[in-house]
Amino acid sequence: MEADALSPVELGLLLLPFVVMLLAALCVRCRELPASYDSASTESLYPRSILIKPPQITVPRTPATSYPLVTSFPPLRQPDLLPIPRSPQPLGGSHRMPSSRQNSDDANSVASYENQEPARKNVDEDEDEDDYPEGYLVVLPDSSPAAVPVVSSAPVPSNPDLGDSAFSMESCEDYVNVPESEESAEASLDGSREYVNVSQDAQPVIRAELASVTSQEVEDEEEEDVDGEEAPDYENLQELN
């Protein structure tokens, strides 16, 4: 009578806690399934230990002697280990140089080329210094007084050696050959040298005197050649300026 008196609403309220508990248990079970499935899959791929049960071998008894049964087991084999995959290494990774190091190497190379030019200049200067002789010549300016006395009006004797002096004057040189005599010895530093320096003012006068002397000598030689019995076939004549 009491069961008939319960309405469907009251019956649903009584069963509601059981339904909620059942749903909660199912949800918890569903959450645990993926973790257990992952562990089972990894164990199936990488087995930790495989136990192989060897077959039992029985030895028959002999009639003469009685021995207990002896069971022999084959040696256990270690499970084959699967290779562990490794991450691929990049090719040529060790040969690459960082950009900062390359930039520093380029800078050092440019600096080395720039430093070579001053070194070459120094080498050239050293070579030029080596080319100079050991002794140095001291050049006096034109304004400084000459240490050698200047002979302006010296008697010029008629001597064939004066032809060489005329040639030297024509070549614009600053010295004149003087014959060995008392006057020339006094004029040439007490006879230590055979020539004296001539100033620029006295050069035209000496040139005129030497030219007149050489022309007179040439005329005398021509007269002697005409008067002589054996005359040379040819004769070199110096053109006088």
Swiss-Prot record:
Region (Disordered): 78-139, 209-241
Subcellular location(s) of the protein: Cell membrane
Maturation and modification: Phosphorylated on tyrosines by ZAP70 upon TCR activation, or by SYK upon other immunoreceptor activation; which leads to the recruitment of multiple signaling molecules. Is one of the most prominently tyrosine-phosphorylated proteins detected following TCR engagement. May be dephosphorylated by PTPRJ.
Main location: membrane
Keywords linked to the UniProt accession: Adaptive immunity, Cell membrane, Immunity, Lipoprotein, Mast cell degranulation, Membrane, Palmitate, Phosphoprotein, Signal-anchor, Transmembrane, Transmembrane helix, Ubl conjugation
Ranges of Polar residues composition bias in the record: 97-115
Positions with biased composition (Acidic residues): 124-133, 217-233
Region of interest (Interaction with PLCG1), ranges: 136-139
GO cellular component, one term: cell-cell junction
Interaction with GRB2, GRAP2 and PIK3R1 as annotated region, ranges: 175-178, 195-198
Source species, domain of life: Eukaryota
Membrane topology: Single-pass type III membrane protein
Lipid-anchored residues (S-palmitoyl cysteine): 27, 30
TM region positions: 5-28
Cytoplasmic topological intervals: 29-241
Extracellular face of the membrane: 1-4
Modified sites of kind Phosphotyrosine: 175, 234
Tissue: Expressed in NK cells. Present in lymph node, spleen and thymus (at protein level).
Residues bearing the modification Phosphoserine: 41, 44, 87, 104, 109, 112, 199, 212, 215
Additional free-text comment from the UniProt record: Engagement of killer inhibitory receptors (KIR) disrupts the interaction of PLCG1 with LAT and blocks target cell-induced activation of PLC, maybe by inducing the dephosphorylation of LAT.
Purpose: Required for TCR (T-cell antigen receptor)- and pre-TCR-mediated signaling, both in mature T-cells and during their development. Involved in FCGR3 (low affinity immunoglobulin gamma Fc region receptor III)-mediated signaling in natural killer cells and FCER1 (high affinity immunoglobulin epsilon receptor)-mediated signaling in mast cells.
Subunit structure of this chain's protein: When phosphorylated, interacts directly with the PIK3R1 subunit of phosphoinositide 3-kinase and the SH2 domains of GRB2, GRAP, GRAP2, PLCG1 and PLCG2. Interacts indirectly with CBL, SOS, VAV, and LCP2. Interacts with SHB, SKAP2 and CLNK. Interacts with FCGR1A. Interacts with GRB2, PLCG1 and THEMIS upon TCR activation in thymocytes. Interacts with THEMIS2.
Protein name: Linker for activation of T-cells family member 1
UniProt lineage: Eukaryota, Metazoa, Chordata, Craniata, Vertebrata
Gene: Lat
